[in-house]
């Protein structure tokens, strides 16, 4: 099998930047309701803010005082619209039965039949899907590729971060070599802090 898991990077913040003609990789922008207190949780921050050391889903008061940033009011209807447009662009290439929407900014695609159909390989196909997402939304995507949903998701969460092209790829061998001993194990999809100590034994 071949599954591709696609994630839209800092989705809410990236949509807000795209709608303003700004680059989320160079723009400090926070999605949070400014009418609430400094205890308000930031729903999203741009990659530029992450690079400056700001943690995702922090409170507004936790942003270091030296960092200047724009604040965007959350617009869930707009994010759902953009998400729908992106999924629509994928559905021009794959059948609905082979696409599973996991969340507003993430989906799984059973790519195996399409690699034969389009005479391509998984990495090239993932790049094509990522490019389509960017063309319709100006939002950058990352991807994980694996023989099943679990390994594709782990490839996305752990390997794609360090890949220059934003694509992580795992097979059974590289999973055992690279993920088996990965710590903290809570980085791995489905392993919550409560179960981690038992699994670590």
What are the language-model segments listed below?
Residues 121-187:
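Long, highly charged, low-complexity intrinsically disordered interaction regions
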Residues 111-113, 145-147, 193-195:
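Short, structured patches in soluble enzyme cores that scaffold and shape functional sites
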Residues 1-108, 113:
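Residues that scaffold, gate, or flank divalent-cation-dependent active/transport sites
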Residues 50, 135, 200:
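Short polybasic/polar patches that bind polyanions
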Residues 7, 105, 143, 180-201:
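Helix-hairpin-helix
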Residues 94, 100-102, 106-140:
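Short loop/hinge segments at the start of secondary-structure elements
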């Amino acid at each position: 099998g071949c599954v591709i898991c696609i994630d839209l990077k800092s989705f809410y913040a990236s949509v807000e930047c795209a709608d303003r003609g700004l680059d989320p990789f160079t723009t400090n922008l926070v999605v949070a309701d400014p009418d609430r207190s400094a205890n308000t949780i930031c729903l999203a921050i741009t990659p530029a803010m992450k690079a400056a050391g700001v943690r995702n889903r922090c409170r507004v008061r936790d942003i270091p005082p030296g960092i200047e940033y724009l604040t965007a009011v959350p617009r869930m209807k707009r994010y759902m619209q953009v998400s729908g447009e992106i999924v629509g662009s994928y559905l021009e290439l794959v059948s609905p039965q082979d696409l599973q929407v996991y969340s507003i900014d993430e989906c799984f695609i059973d790519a195996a039949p399409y690699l034969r159909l389009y005479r391509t390989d998984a990495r090239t196909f993932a790049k094509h899907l990522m490019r389509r997402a960017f063309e319709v939304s100006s939002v950058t995507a990352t991807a994980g590729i694996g023989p099943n949903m679990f390994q594709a998701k782990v490839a996305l969460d752990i390997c794609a971060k360090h890949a220059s092209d934003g694509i992580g790829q795992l097979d059974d061998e590289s999973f055992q070599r690279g993920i088996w001993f990965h710590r903290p194990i809570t980085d791995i999809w489905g392993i919550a802090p409560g179960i981690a100590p038992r699994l670590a034994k």
